[in-house]
Amino acid sequence: MPPIALLSVSNKEGLIPLAKELSIEYGFEIISSGGTAKTLQQAGILVTPVAEYTGAPEILGGRVKTLHPKVHGGILAKKGDLFHQKDLKDQKIKAIDLVVVNLYPFQETIKKPNISWEEAIENIDIGGPAMVRAAAKNHESVSVLTRPEQYQPFLQALKKGTLSNEMRRELAKEAFEHTANYDNAISRWMKLNAEKKSSQWIESIPLKQTLRYGENPHQSASWYSHQDQGWGGAKQIQGKELSMNNLLDLEAALSTIREFGYDENLLATTSQKAAVVIKHTNPCGVATANSVSLALKKALDADRTSAFGGIVAVNSSIDLATASELKNLFLECVIAPNFENDAKLLLSEKKNLRLLEMNKYYIDQSERNNIRSILGGLLIQESDDELIDEKSWEVVTKKQPSSIEKKDLTFAWKVVKHIRSNAIAIASSGQTIGIGAGQMNRIGAAKIALETAGDKAKKAVLASDGFFPFDDTVRMAASHGITAIIQPGGSIKDNLSIEACNELNISMIFTGRRHFLH
């Protein structure tokens, strides 16, 4: 009796060569359903339609094709089990040796604009996952292929006679991963369209890359990413392989630069170009200007010592002038919406420098959750990426900030939310001039930021990610010449800070919004 292959695929890539080789070279009888059978018949390949084999027609508009004992009995029967073989014989069921199935394109369907609920639901495969799971369960007797990339290795194993149980077990593992990813895509889509939060967190993300190591050389690390979201859509156009530390810093850089708009067409839509320099996930320099090259220069000038070996992000296309500034620096990575051709050519001389293009589409498609692992579980929160709402701000001092101060306060507030707590940012003329990050007390963060700013702190503004528990930060700021402050407010001793500001002729804004970052 010839071996039997059941073929039912949505992705027809590689289908005809596979079926021809199975049929001609190895004598497989091919059973197939629907569009797959039609494709094979048009290619001149002998096929037994599923409906002909089972004696049951497709019903419910194609919703039921392969859900039949003659299909699932043939897949699930163990070859070495006499009782199973007797059942097959009694029921006139053929044992199936190979299942080649990939599923309805649900993930592709839900990417379409204005997709209806009904269309998405109709692209949820039922029979396909059932066959894949059945074959994977019975992998000692049945091989299962779920991706075109598996076809040639499988045929090579057939040719060499090396189709081992170990290979079938690996194919079974990949099959269960395939159906798990599929079910997760459906679950995620329904979750996004549901009003209530899910009682379980289910996520299935494919492996993109095994990294050289983690934060330190003795730690192993891997990178998992959706291909159509976030970093899965980033294009590395040159440079060494990304490390885990690179990715963490790039995430911090992208989160910060998005505060100022991020678009490859930004040159035509706004005059606010921005540049960010990141070191160990903290901004060490941020600036805005009328050109990307000037914004970059200002961001670097904020703290050139810390910028050494850092990550740079800009929010618009990198032109030749910007590339000329970058060429003279030692940096790990540069990320932008786009690199102009002459900029690419110039930077290609720095072969180790990693250049990445990130299209705004992939950022917008990302589900914005912040996930942290703890012992035995996960902590999941919404990402702190809401836009600034200045209407909710309140000037709580007698002195009002000037228009120039207000502009710098807004700038500093955008930056400070991306600095590790306790965080202080000092800014002047659209440029950070002092940053205090990750301190155990707020006055300590302010001291670092003010000392970094030096004489530039005179007539500058200060932003704090959390409230002032005492008036000591205000008084220290005043002693260095700070003229305006922005902070969340909310301390039971807010009045002390307000009184100190009034005494020292400093304006202060309460935003009503805290931005801790741990």
From Swiss-Prot:
Q: Which PANTHER family match?
A: BIFUNCTIONAL PURINE BIOSYNTHESIS PROTEIN ATIC, BIFUNCTIONAL PURINE BIOSYNTHESIS PROTEIN PURH
Q: Which residues form the MGS-like domain?
A: 1-146
PROSITE patterns noted in UniProt: MGS
- Annotated coiled-coil positions are none
Taxonomically, the superkingdom here is Bacteria
Statement: the UniProt record of this protein carries the keyword Hydrolase: yes
Q: Which GO terms describe its cellular component?
A: cytosol
Q: What is its EC number?
A: 2.1.2.3, 3.5.4.10
> Per the record, what about its domains?
The IMP cyclohydrolase activity resides in the N-terminal region.
For this entry, list what GO says about its biological process: 'de novo' IMP biosynthetic process
Its keywords, alphabetically, are: Hydrolase, Multifunctional enzyme, Purine biosynthesis, Transferase
Question: What GO molecular function annotations does the UniProt record carry, in alphabetical order?
Answer: IMP cyclohydrolase activity; phosphoribosylaminoimidazolecarboxamide formyltransferase activity
Keyword Hydrolase assigned: yes
- What is the protein name stated in its UniProt record? Bifunctional purine biosynthesis protein PurH
Q: Which InterPro entries match?
A: AICAR_Tfase_dup_dom_sf, Cytidine_deaminase-like, MGS-like_dom, MGS-like_dom_sf, PurH-like
